[in-house]
């Protein structure tokens, strides 16, 4: 009796998938209004995670730690002690600037 042993092998190599190729979208954090810049009430001064820069005079802090201006004025970044910074907004006479 004739016994045939037929074995089929793969004609293409098995290919694994790569674990690369994805990244999270950037969050666009950082300083949005620079020192000495005129801002309107509600303008964002700094977008941040945590309180890297603390709110100073006339500056509010949002629930995501974003600092924003409470009044129209000029932004000033100041040091508090040795290792802390704060952002403040000081009112400015708009008529004096226009002249």
Swiss-Prot record:
Residues 1-9 form a propeptide. GO terms for biological process: translation. Gene3D superfamilies: 2.40.50.100. Disulfide bonds: none annotated. Keywords: Ribonucleoprotein, Ribosomal protein. It holds the Pfam family Ribosomal_L27. InterPro entries: Ribosomal_bL27, Ribosomal_bL27_CS. GO terms for molecular function: structural constituent of ribosome. The N-terminus is cleaved by ribosomal processing cysteine protease Prp. One of its GO terms (cellular component) is cytosolic large ribosomal subunit. Belongs to the bacterial ribosomal protein bL27 family. HAMAP family: Ribosomal_bL27. This is Large ribosomal subunit protein bL27. The lineage of its organism: Bacteria, Bacillati, Bacillota, Clostridia, Eubacteriales. The gene is rpmA.
